[in-house]
Amino acid sequence: MKTAFSLETVNTRYQEPNRNRVESKYYWEELFQLVGAGGFHAVELPYDPGFMGARCCFPFSKVVMDVKFGGVEGFKKVLADAKIDKIAGIFASPRAAGSVEQYVEGFKRSVKGMLGLAGELGCDYVTVSASPEYCTMGALLDKKAELLDALAAALGELADEAGDIKLCVRNEFWGILRGAGMHDFMAKVDKRVGYCVDLAHIKIAGEDPAEFIRKAGDRVGVVILTDTCFEDKDEVWKGPAPAFPRTGATQVFKDLGQGSVDLCAVFAALKEVGFDGWATVDNRQTRQVSRGILRARYALNAVEG
């Protein structure tokens, strides 16, 4: 099993004191050094081709890599200087509205763009969210079965274009593929498409991550090592901004090792199914990125012995 560190750990979408520092190139250059020093020699990138254009240094699109880092090779050199020798994968949560046809066509365009960039970056995997957030679906909820059938067919087409890149579907607790519902959907999808198993999302949806992995079996394509203590007693998943509940606990995700996900059981299940792909740490909503890197390394060392 190989480990990577996701740059989604950095808060780029919500305001906080001194948030603008993350728009500076020096911030990312130092972050890469910290990631490498923490023993992570591969990273995962969020993909957002239009976010902020080239006005900041979030390395999440080809445009920013070209303008701020001198292209893909220039970006990879910055990583290499920090002892990061691999971009393991990229991910996105394509969002669209309108009819089933409009949603699926928008989804396909987004994934094709991801696959193109992943090829340039030398990624091993691309992960996508096939389901929109429940609260944004509107009229699509009445056509759920039609939408899922169309998405399953689209993923089969995209698998043809993926080539050696492993295309995986992410599970999210706020989508219509939450929890065990993912298995029914994946049964319809081309076997070349794998599961992207996000531990915290599975647990919040009321499932046991280790059992989920066993049921997915050899179709586990990538594992996202997330943690949580959150219990969705108020069905936050159905409302707006489910990652930021309006009542009760306001931090849904925890740094790896700080929540209630049983990592030992997860790693045992991964061994049972013969998983040898990427396990990517994502400390989303961390209160301090540098501390989160060390917490994750400590948690992995404890599990791996």
Task: Enumerate the language-model features and the residues they cover.
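Acidic/histidine-rich catalytic cores of soluble enzymes
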Residues: N11-R19, K25, A42-V43, A152-S260
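Short acidic/polar active-site loop segments enriched in Thr and Asp
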Residues: H41, D85, D124, G221, ...
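A short, acidic, flexible beta-alpha connecting loop/helix-capping segment that sits on the rim
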Residues: T280-R291
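N-terminal pre-domain/capping segments
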Residues: M1-E120, D164, K191-G194, R297-G305
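Catalytic-face loop-and-helix region of soluble metabolic enzyme cores
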Residues: T226-T228, C264, K271
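A cross-domain feature marking catalytic cores of carbohydrate-active enzymes
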Residues: F5-T9, L45-P49, A88-S93, V128-P132, ...
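Generic structural signal for well-ordered alpha-helices
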Residues: E29-V35, V72-K76, V111-L115, A152-A159, ...
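Active-site acidic/histidine proton-transfer and metal-coordination neighborhood
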Residues: G74, V78-A82, K86, R95-G194, ...
